[in-house]
Amino acid sequence: MKHVRLLVFTLLLLPALAAGQQSAPPAPGATPPQTGTTPPVSARVSLDDAIRMSLQHNHALQALRSTIQQSLAEEITANLRPNPTLGLDAQFLPIFQPSQFSSDYIDQQAQFDAGVGYLFERGKKRQHRLQAARDQTALTRSLVSDSERQLVYNVGQQFVDVLLAESTLEFAQQDLESFKKTVDISNERFRVGDMSEGDFLKIELQLLQFQSDVSAARLARIQSLAALRQLLGFESVPDDYDVQGTLDYQPVRADLTGLKSVAAINRPDLRAAQQAVTAAESQLSLQKANGKMDITGTFNYTHTAGVNTGAFYYSMPLPIFNRNQGEIARAQFAITQAQEQAGETAQQVSTDVVQAFANLQTNDQIIQLYQGGYVEQAKKSRDISEYAYRKGAASLLDYLDSERTYRANQLAYRQALASYMLALEQMRQAVGTRNLP
């Protein structure tokens, strides 16, 4: 009896143990299975990170890269041989006189034919088709590379815009906090009768301008980050992402001749223009091959009157009128067009380098002017006027004028730094590489 009760108790306990095992929490340190990847909670993106993300996640670029796979698929099509043809027929069957159906009738009276045909391409058409497709693939790769170059430039440009917006916002917030202290001091002077009500109202109204500057700078930062995220791919960064970096001046010492040489080697659009000439020449060779008449060969087996026979047939169009003259002429003019476009692209590359170099030099000179003393002079003038005003030794108008001059100088200096960094990005785009000589 004890054994029976023990057996019943065990059977009742097993389901509970199984349920407990199924619902048991994971062990400490165990990692649950990942069903998908999600962006981090927060992220600070550097310029190099932004470029890498855009090349990996930008949907427009990904769509364009698919054209390379399409060109590779066209190479497969171009290399295919013609399919053979199969023909079957049965003649003189007594369909309307079924009583005559017999093995003797089928053997002696009916006729059966079976034939196999094949198109023999002349002029090495398949080889020329494949070469033309390969040249088109090479051209497509270069065009995609040029789109990557344009995307990298756009990312760099937008990244600098974000840095400028953040620098402007930081300065506006600092300026607002500093001016609030001036308002507090002015309020105390007005309370003790050391300042007129009109002057105090001017101070308070000026505070509105500082607050408006902060709001405008904050909006510019949000818009710049959104525009940059569009280039990076929205799913590659979290909603509250930020950039890592500051407005910086990095002098570049390079000569124009060396930059032109680098551009001639690295610019993918120039390479694409040269490959377009090669592709046009391949098309001309293909059209000349298409002018060669193909031969169709057929072997036909026939059974009739109890006799099995075979026959060979060959056919070829006579090239009297159509020898593909029009397409050959068109391909020749296409070569001329591609050559002219390649020359135009080479000139455009030189023009881009010259313009970018001049822009970089001009912005470099402007930075030198600001760093040569104008920034410090404006700050020193503002500090002196602020100290004198707080001590009652300067008028309100003099102080406000020095404050406006300082703000304008700081904003212009930040804009000059951003313009220089944009000019540097333009130079990198013009030479086709981020590693300047």
Language-model segments: residues:
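N-terminal signal peptide c-region/cleavage motif recognized by signal peptidases
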Residues: 15-16
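Small/polar, glycine/serine/threonine/aspartate-rich low-complexity segments that form flexible
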Residues: 32-43, 76, 87-122, 129, ...
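Periplasmic alpha-helical coiled-coil/stalk elements that build and connect Gram-negative outer-membrane
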Residues: 3, 144-262, 359, 363
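Amphipathic alpha-helical coiled-coil segments
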Residues: 63-78, 147, 151-172, 181-183, ...
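Amphipathic alpha-helical coiled-coil scaffold segments and their short linker/junction regions
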Residues: 54-55, 117, 139, 195, ...
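Acidic, low-complexity, intrinsically disordered peripheral segments
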Residues: 2-11, 20-23, 37-39, 412-437
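Metallo-beta-lactamase
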Residues: 217, 268-269, 338, 416
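Mature N-terminal segment immediately following signal peptide/propeptide cleavage
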Residues: 42-67
